[in-house]
């Protein structure tokens, strides 16, 4: 049975798709340009990645795809780098093209973070350093990748990063000004701004994408990933830089800011970023650059700090006492003793013996040490455990040695755990002695399992073996560890002297402390790299001679240059003191400061070479090496102490001293060469070997020469050192006597003065005036490094703090879990209240741990979901309290306030309040907890407490809960609105006395505002309908009336209620303080400050009696309530109908009336008033609502706000809203117009018209409607309305409506109007009505007298020369002014106006209504105006009306008043019209008029 299955499997493999010699097995990736397969070679059996690209059938697309494909292949062919995926071959076919590349086993970093989670910053540093190496190589080759992201970064099993997917890559050489590559290529979220704007591409766009990739590795998504691609592209271009993720180090933040510079010209390049401290921190974390420390002391110090943290945690937080709770471990249990650390006197003796033998025969000891280490590691391998699972999940390169701890620590470095008290950490650092070790070793017997280094491969052992042999020469009796370094692989192995004994099974903890993962396999060295290795050996050989200038412990701190013979040195220094300071003084200074650190391994290699080349001098060399190593060890110890105590300020001082000049000062501010430099500067020196090439060319001879040739060059070396180190403008301090120092200083001062005089006397040469430019790449590299010198990196200190913070977090989590386990329904109320208060305080201090409420296990303790238990307890107590009214609960509490025990009802109330506080504290900005509460039906349980039968404090906590639901999660908001009748709950919360508990009302208003701002499942119109049915508008209008229109009686009662409420809360505060003192609680609950919740009112609860701060707060929420009303007023007719109920509008009217009575109305009140007036305006626009507004009495307050009010600033805006509302309300409704007249609308209306502002356009239609349809005209006469209408005749825009209103008024009150038009005086309607009979009898005589007076005083004026005045005339008119105004309608400038035809009809009616008026018009030149209009006008309609006016003149007796000249011109124009006009009607009328004139 097994053979057929095997054959079937083989057949399946054979049946796979193939291309050339490869089988396409599995799909490992898909993209926009093709599919990537995992391929298997048919004959050789190795795997490869094969990219399959389909060839387009269309010729145009086929050519474009072929060009891009060949471009990618040509790029891959020429690229050869360790961090770039390797290209094998190209296999074309008829339908597809196949690119065969190197297969990377673990896939991309994108898959890694999706599969295993986010990467810590320490691991990201390792990977990005390799990406930068690959990018630097690409950019050096002139290649732009253009698609750097995590999906295109492949990771192999040894941790190497490979750049892949060169489908959109291009070469810089292909770009030019004539052919720039402005194509929109790449992935949107990783694109640089210049690519999005199509401004041309450069290598800087890859640096931007690299910064986005770092954020992707740290957070899981690139910047702006939550937005749509188009929106993300807009954000990239508009904002200064993408958002920097929180919780990262300062070095990484600076690195990202260098990547995200908008200007690509100033953006850092990949070569520059390789020198950034964040990238260099990969090598700083390598143990080879750290000073050796006492491992035992470090472990004891760390454990003592943990003990102190645990004790501090236990003292601050009182843990519950329950047998069901798992007790926390004791300090002795939490800090177990170390295994294999039995240090006795015999072991010390063995160590000393082994060390002494090591100094005599170094090579043998090194070999045995290696064997013993490997054997010890193998023997104890089964006993040791891995420190973290990250090593099994991710391939970690050898350069990262502290990622194990940082995988846990880095996400919480900047979180709430940074609040761990630093004094508690630092108190026990220096308090460790042997007694503490004995106490730990005599503990409970638990053992700490120390991880050993992973087993090395054979090739790795061979690469490490030569260094182990070389490192054996440095083994001394004063050191406990020896470190060997492989320069090619950066691998560090640590051995102990006690492990050299083959019979000993002791494993040193230092091995595990400094153990590293396996190194990255390196490629064979090229011939150029081999020559570089030889140069490095030569430089290291010269370091032996530089040791003579190192400082001893007994020397002065600033005397770093030690010369064996001072007189000889002076003779050698005198001829060279005139040299200028070297350019790379700072690097040489750092080199000398770290001479002892960097020479330990180089001396060993030098000695081994001498042993192989010269056997005669073997013993001498060994002795010299031992002596040198002993001095080196002492110097290393001193250096390690100084490194631990130094900071970044000394490094900055060394940098700045290079640019200072102090000739006359003789203190410590001169240029010094201090040995005590920080880790950053030492790291910098160890990574500047390439920058030292030009300096080492002058040092020593080649490695093949003998020591005799080296000895002959000592003088040259000393002189070269002096040239490089000693500037001519600095005072050098020697380690000789004081007299010698004074002589040297005087000599140097003389030399400086002579040089300055010579320099001033000699003119500058042209060569000296030229700008000096750096010529070598090493000088530029140094410039890159110095640009990042301000950024410090202290990895060791941060790591210790992070570890202690993690331990502190574990203790807090245990405490929270213990409290959660006590939340049980069967517990007494006092215990539950105390537990809720403690959990609330803990969650407030440590908000990150609130997620424990929705987890069912932590630290091996599995329990029920805590949020379910809390809701059950809350529901049980809600059922108990639902039958007890709030006034009964308050009374019970009031009578028992002096007793030591609570009643059962009040204990339930207090428990409910504390449970709600715990829930409110846990859901702040926590969407997961909110959604979990929604799923557990928690909303309905909690919102039952919103009704008025429960206590105000309970309802206040419910309002806070509702506000949190509406603030952050759309899901919880939808569940609250649609599934739990949220609209009804919010209205219930508003049903409260504002001045007794406005916090819950404020929360409710905030929640309602947020509901309409967030995206909900229901449309906004449906939400408006839901709220309208729940009487929300009534509650808000009643609330506003309660705030602004409180009566004295209600105010007094509310004040008394508030005082009782305040006394109740103070008593509750005292009882809570007593409980806290008994339980030794330091934190006060949120209810401990009642004075901040409610205003203190003395006489009245009106808003006018509040203080300024309280008034501003109340007014702010009043504006928010007005905003809600304004939003509903813009709804459809159904919402407006619900909103226009009489019980809603009447409260709004009361608010308007109350505010109008205030003497001063500030800007804040004015903004509120504007919103309320806008609400009425929006409602008045609906015809179905106007009658309801009228019934509610809206018109009088609106008219009040049209009047002048001295206390309102910028009253024009108020007039605008009120006038709009009146316009819609008074439109075509005579009854409402009558009400408006009775409310004295005319006076403010005429005032607005006289101001000639923009509101005039709204006021005039209202005035015309009042004139045309009003029955109570006595008010019109009282306000001289007709005079205003006569003024409007001269207004070009309103002359037609004005003459029409006058004509309509004349039809209703013809006698009074014509008397006004004929006399020009102001006539009282009452007087005219009482004397109407006498006036009618004497009308002929009066008319004749008026006509005679007009003839005697009038002057003839041509109508063609009449100009319309722009300013309004006086209210009292003379007799001849009114005819002139009426004749002005016939101005030829009005003929083309659209209202001209409309205006001449009422003029014709006025002429026919009064012969006296006609005579006055004829005397003022009516005939001339008619002739001009008939000649110009071409409209038959208006011409017919003009001919009718002409007929009235011809047929009336007033024709005799027309002179002969006017008659002739009239006859002439009528004759022309009768013959030439196009209209037959016009011709006929003109012919009849001609006949009349002929008679």
Swiss-Prot record:
Its cofactor is Mg(2+). SUPFAM superfamilies: ARM repeat (SSF48371), Protein kinase-like (PK-like) (SSF56112). It comes from Dictyostelium discoideum (Social amoeba). Pfam families: Pkinase. The keyword Transport does not apply. It is an enzyme of class 2 (transferase). The lineage of its organism: Eukaryota, Amoebozoa, Evosea, Eumycetozoa, Dictyostelia. Keywords: ATP-binding, Kinase, Magnesium, Metal-binding, Nucleotide-binding, Serine/threonine-protein kinase, Transferase. The active site is at residue 147. One of its GO terms (cellular component) is cytoplasm. Residues 315-419, 476-519, 593-646, 693-712, 1325-1373 are annotated as: Disordered. One of its GO terms (molecular function) is protein serine kinase activity. Residues 404-419 have a biased composition (Polar residues). Its EC number is 2.7.11.1. Residues 22-279 form the Protein kinase domain. It catalyses: L-seryl-[protein] + ATP = O-phospho-L-seryl-[protein] + ADP + H(+); L-threonyl-[protein] + ATP = O-phospho-L-threonyl-[protein] + ADP + H(+). ATP binds at residues 28-36, 51. This is Probable serine/threonine-protein kinase DDB_G0278901. Belongs to the protein kinase superfamily. Ser/Thr protein kinase family. PROSITE patterns: PROTEIN_KINASE_ATP (PS00107), PROTEIN_KINASE_DOM (PS50011), PROTEIN_KINASE_ST (PS00108). Residues 319-403, 476-515, 594-646, 1325-1372 have a biased composition (Low complexity).
């Amino acid at each position: 049975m097994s053979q057929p299955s095997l054959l079937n499997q083989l057949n399946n493999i054979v049946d796979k798709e193939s291309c050339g010699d490869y089988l396409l097995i599995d799909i490992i990736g898909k993209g926009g340009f093709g599919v990537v397969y995992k391929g298997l070679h048919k004959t050789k059996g190795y795997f490869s990645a094969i990219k399959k690209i389909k060839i387009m059938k269309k010729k145009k697309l086929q050519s474009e795809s072929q060009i891009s494909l060949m471009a990618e292949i040509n790029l891959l062919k020429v690229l050869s780098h360790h961090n770039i995926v390797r290209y094998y071959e190209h296999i074309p076919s008829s339908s597809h093209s196949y690119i065969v590349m190197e297969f990377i086993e673990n896939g991309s970093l994108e898959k890694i973070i999706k599969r295993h989670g986010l990467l810590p910053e320490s691991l990201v540093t390792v990977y990005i350093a390799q990406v930068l190496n690959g990018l630097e190589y690409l950019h050096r080759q002139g290649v732009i990748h253009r698609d750097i992201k995590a999906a295109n970064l492949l990771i192999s099993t040894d941790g190497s990063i490979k750049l892949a997917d060169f489908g959109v890559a291009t070469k810089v050489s292909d770009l030019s000004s004539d052919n720039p590559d402005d194509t929109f290529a790449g992935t949107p979220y990783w694109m640089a701004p210049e690519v999005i704007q199509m401004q041309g591409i450069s290598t800087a766009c890859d640096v931007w994408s690299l910064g986005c990739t770092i954020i992707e590795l740290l957070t899981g998504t690139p910047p702006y990933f939550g937005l749509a691609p188009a929106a993300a592209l807009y954000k990239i271009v508009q904002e200064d830089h993408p958002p920097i993720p929180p919780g990262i180090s300062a070095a990484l933040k600076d690195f990202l800011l260098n990547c995200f510079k908008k200007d690509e010209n100033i953006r850092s390049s990949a070569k520059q970023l390789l020198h950034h401290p964040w990238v260099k921190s990969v090598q700083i974390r390598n143990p080879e650059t750290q000073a050796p420390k006492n491992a035992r002391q470090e472990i004891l110090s760390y454990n003592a700090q943990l003990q102190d943290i645990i004790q501090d945690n236990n003292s601050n937080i009182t843990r519950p006492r329950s047998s069901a709770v798992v007790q926390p471990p004791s300090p002795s249990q939490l800090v177990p003793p170390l295994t294999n650390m039995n240090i006795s006197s015999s072991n010390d003796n063995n160590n000393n013996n082994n060390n002494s033998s090591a100094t005599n025969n170094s090579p043998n000891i090194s070999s045995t040490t290696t064997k013993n280490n490997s054997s010890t590691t193998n023997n104890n391998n089964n006993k040791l455990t891995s420190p973290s699972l990250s090593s099994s999940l991710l391939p970690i390169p050898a350069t990262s040695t502290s990622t194990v701890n940082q995988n846990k620590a880095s996400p919480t470095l900047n979180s709430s755990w940074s609040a761990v008290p630093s004094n508690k950490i630092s108190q026990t650092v220096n308090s460790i002695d042997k007694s503490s070790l004995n106490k730990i070793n005599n503990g409970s017997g638990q053992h700490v399992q120390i991880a050993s280094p992973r087993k090395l491969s054979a090739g790795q052992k061979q690469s490490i073996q030569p260094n182990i042999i070389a490192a054996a020469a440095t083994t001394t009796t004063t050191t406990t560890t020896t470190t060997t370094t492989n320069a090619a692989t950066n691998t560090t192995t640590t051995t102990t002297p006690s492990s050299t004994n083959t019979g000993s099974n002791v494993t040193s903890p230092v091995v595990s402390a400094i153990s590293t993962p396996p190194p990255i396999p390196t490629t064979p060295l090229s011939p150029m790299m081999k020559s570089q290795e030889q140069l490095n050996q030569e430089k290291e050989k010269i370091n032996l001679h530089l040791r003579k200038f190192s400082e001893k412990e007994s020397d002065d701190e600033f005397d770093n240059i030690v010369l064996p013979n001072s007189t000889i040195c002076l003779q050698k220094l005198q001829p060279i003191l005139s040299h200028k300071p070297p350019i790379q003084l700072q690097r040489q200074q750092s080199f000398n400061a770290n001479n002892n650190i960097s020479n330990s391994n180089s001396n060993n290699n030098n000695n081994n070479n001498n042993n192989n080349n010269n056997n005669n001098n073997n013993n001498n060399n060994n002795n010299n090496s031992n002596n040198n190593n002993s001095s080196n060890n002492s110097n290393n110890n001193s250096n390690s102490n100084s490194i631990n105590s130094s900071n970044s300020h000394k490094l900055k001082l060394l940098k700045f001293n290079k640019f200072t000049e102090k000739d006359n000062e003789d203190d410590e501010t001169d240029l010094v060469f201090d040995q005590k430099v920080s880790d950053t500067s030492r790291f910098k020196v160890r990574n500047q070997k390439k920058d030292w090439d030009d300096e080492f060319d002058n040092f020593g001879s080649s490695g093949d020469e003998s020591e005799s040739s080296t000895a002959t060059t000592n003088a040259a070396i000393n002189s070269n050192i002096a040239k490089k180190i000693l500037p001519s403008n600095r005072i050098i301090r020697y380690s000789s006597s004081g007299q010698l120092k004074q002589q040297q200083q005087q000599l140097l001062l003389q030399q400086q003065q002579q040089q300055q005089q010579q320099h001033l006397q000699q003119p500058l040469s042209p060569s000296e005036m030229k700008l000096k430019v750096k010529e070598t790449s090493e000088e530029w590299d140094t410039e890159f490094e110095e640009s990042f010198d301000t950024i410090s990196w202290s990895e060791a200190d941060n790591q210790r703090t992070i570890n202690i913070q993690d331990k502190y977090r574990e203790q807090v989590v245990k405490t929270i879990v213990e409290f959660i386990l006590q939340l049980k329904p069967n517990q007494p109320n006092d215990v539950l209240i105390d537990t809720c208060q403690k959990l609330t305080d803990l969650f407030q201090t440590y908000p990150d741990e609130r997620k424990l409420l929705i987890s069912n296990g932590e630290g091996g303790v599995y329990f029920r979901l805590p949020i379910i238990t809390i809701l059950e307890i809350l529901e049980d107590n809600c059922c108990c309290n639902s039958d007890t009214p709030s006034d009964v609960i308050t009374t019970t509490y009031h009578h028992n306030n002096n007793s030591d025990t609570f009643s059962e009802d009040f204990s339930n109330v207090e428990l409910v309040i504390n449970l709600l506080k715990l829930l409110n504290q846990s859901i702040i900005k926590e969407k997961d907890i909110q959604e979990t509460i929604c799923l557990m039906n928690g909303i309905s349980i909690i919102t039952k407490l919103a009704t008025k039968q429960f206590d105000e404090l309970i309802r206040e906590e419910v309002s806070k809960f509702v506000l949190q639901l509406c603030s952050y999660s759309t899901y919880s908001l939808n569940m609250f609105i649609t599934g739990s009748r949220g609209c009804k709950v919010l209205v219930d919360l508003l049903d409260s006395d504002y001045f007794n508990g406005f916090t819950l009302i404020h929360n409710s208003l905030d929640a309602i505002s947020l509901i309409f701002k967030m995206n909900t499942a229901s449309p906004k119109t449906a939400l408006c309908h839901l709220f309208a049915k729940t009487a929300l508008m009534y509650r808000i209008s009643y609330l506003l009336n309660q705030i602004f229109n409180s009566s004295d009686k209600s105010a007094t009662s509310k004040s008394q209620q508030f005082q009782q409420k305040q006394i109740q809360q103070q008593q509750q505060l005292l009882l809570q303080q007593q409980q806290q003192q008994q339980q030794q609680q330091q934190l006060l609950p949120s209810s401990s400050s009642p004075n901040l919740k409610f205003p203190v009112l003395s006489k009245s609860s009106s808003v006018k009696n509040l203080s300024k701060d309280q008034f501003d707060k109340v007014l702010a929420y009043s504006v928010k309530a007005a905003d809600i009303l304004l939003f509903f007023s813009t709804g459809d007719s159904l919402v407006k109908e619900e909103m226009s109920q009489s019980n809603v509008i009447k409260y709004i009217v009361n608010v308007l009336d109350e505010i109008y009575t205030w003497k001063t109305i500030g800007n804040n009140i004015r903004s509120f008033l504007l919103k309320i007036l806008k609400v009425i305006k929006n409602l008045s626009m609906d015809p179905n609502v106007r009658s309801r507004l009228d019934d509610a009495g809206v018109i009088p307050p609106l008219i009040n706000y049209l009047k002048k009010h001295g206390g309102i600033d910028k009253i024009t805006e108020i007039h605008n809203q009120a006038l709009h509302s009146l316009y819609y309300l008074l439109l075509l409704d005579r009854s409402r117009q009558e009400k408006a007249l009775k409310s004295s609308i005319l006076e403010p209306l005429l005032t607005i018209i006289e101001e000639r502002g923009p509101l005039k356009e709204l006021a005039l239609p209202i005035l015309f409607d009042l004139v045309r349809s009003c029955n109570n005209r006595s008010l019109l006469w009282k306000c001289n309305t007709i005079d205003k209408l006569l003024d409007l005749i001269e207004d070009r825009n309103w002359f037609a409506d004005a003459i029409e209103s006058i004509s309509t008024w004349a039809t209703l009150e013809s006698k009074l109007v014509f008397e006004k038009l004929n006399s020009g005086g102001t006539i009282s309607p009452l007087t005219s009505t009482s004397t109407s009979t006498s006036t009618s009898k004497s009308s002929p005589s009066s008319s004749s007298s008026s006509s005679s007076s007009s003839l005697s005083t009038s002057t003839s004026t041509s109508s063609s020369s009449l100009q319309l005045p722009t300013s309004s005339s006086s209210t009292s008119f003379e007799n001849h002014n009114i005819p002139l105004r009426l004749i002005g309608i016939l101005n030829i400038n009005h003929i083309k106006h659209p209202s001209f035809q409309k205006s001449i009809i009422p003029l014709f009616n006025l002429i026919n209504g009064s012969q006296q008026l006609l005579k006055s018009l004829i005397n003022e030149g009516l005939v001339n105006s008619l002739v001009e209009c008939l000649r110009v006008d071409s409209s038959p309609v208006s011409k017919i009306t003009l001919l009718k006016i002409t007929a009235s003149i011809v047929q009336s007796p007033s024709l005799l008043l027309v002179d002969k000249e006017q008659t002739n011109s009239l006859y002439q124009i009528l004759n022309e019209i009768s013959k030439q006009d196009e209209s037959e009607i016009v011709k006929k009328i003109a012919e009849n008029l001609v006949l009349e004139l002929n008679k």
